[in-house]
């Protein structure tokens, strides 16, 4: 598998994603940013239940609350637009990681999102080290941060 397989995704803008002006509603950019990194780890080979807690089975003992997020809109994103979503994750320290998402339409960057997550124990809420699987995904992704496919 090539890094582009899990780092460059597609998103089609739907009617329900947009506001009355016909452009995406602002909160959807952060939603799409989060969904993109979730999809990316699954394509990479990490089952989502290994990362995100399922309270019925309690497989994961780690939670990743968002401690910072930003969205920048550089051009209108409208109904029917087909976007490439380029994911660029990196580790900040032992318990923090950041995922940048770049939204590209017709070869031009039209928006970007940034989400920073903190790794916490689900019960104590103490900061803990990022899980090995997530670290491997970040490392494998950073080997190819210069993807030219976009």
Swiss-Prot record:
It is an enzyme of class 3 (hydrolase). It catalyses: 1,4-dihydroxy-2-naphthoyl-CoA + H2O = 1,4-dihydroxy-2-naphthoate + CoA + H(+). Keywords: Hydrolase. Pathway: Cofactor biosynthesis; phylloquinone biosynthesis; Quinol/quinone metabolism; 1,4-dihydroxy-2-naphthoate biosynthesis; 1,4-dihydroxy-2-naphthoate from chorismate: step 7/7. The active site is at 19. Pfam families: 4HBT_2 (PF13279). InterPro entries: DHNA_CoA_hydrolase, HotDog_dom_sf. It comes from the Bacteria. One of its GO terms (molecular function) is 1,4-dihydroxy-2-naphthoyl-CoA thioesterase activity. GO terms for biological process: phylloquinone biosynthetic process. Its EC number is 3.1.2.28. Belongs to the 4-hydroxybenzoyl-CoA thioesterase family. DHNA-CoA hydrolase subfamily. Catalyzes the hydrolysis of 1,4-dihydroxy-2-naphthoyl-CoA (DHNA-CoA) to 1,4-dihydroxy-2-naphthoate (DHNA), a reaction involved in phylloquinone (vitamin K1) biosynthesis. This is 1,4-dihydroxy-2-naphthoyl-CoA hydrolase.
């Amino acid at each position: 598998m090539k890094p582009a397989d899990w780092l460059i995704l597609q998103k089609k803008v739907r009617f329900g994603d947009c506001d009355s002006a016909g452009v995406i509603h602002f909160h959807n950019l952060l939603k799409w940013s989060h969904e993109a990194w979730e999809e990316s780890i699954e394509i990479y080979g990490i089952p989502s239940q290994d990362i995100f807690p399922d309270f019925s089975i309690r497989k994961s003992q780690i939670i990743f609350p968002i401690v910072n997020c930003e969205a920048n809109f550089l051009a209108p994103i409208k109904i029917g637009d087909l976007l490439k979503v380029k994911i660029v994750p990196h580790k900040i320290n032992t318990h923090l990681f950041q995922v940048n998402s770049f939204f590209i339409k017709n070869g031009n960057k039209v928006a970007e999102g940034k989400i920073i997550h903190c790794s916490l124990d689900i019960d104590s809420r103490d900061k803990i080290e990022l899980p090995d699987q997530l670290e491997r995904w970040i490392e494998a992704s950073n080997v190819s941060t210069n993807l030219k496919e976009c």
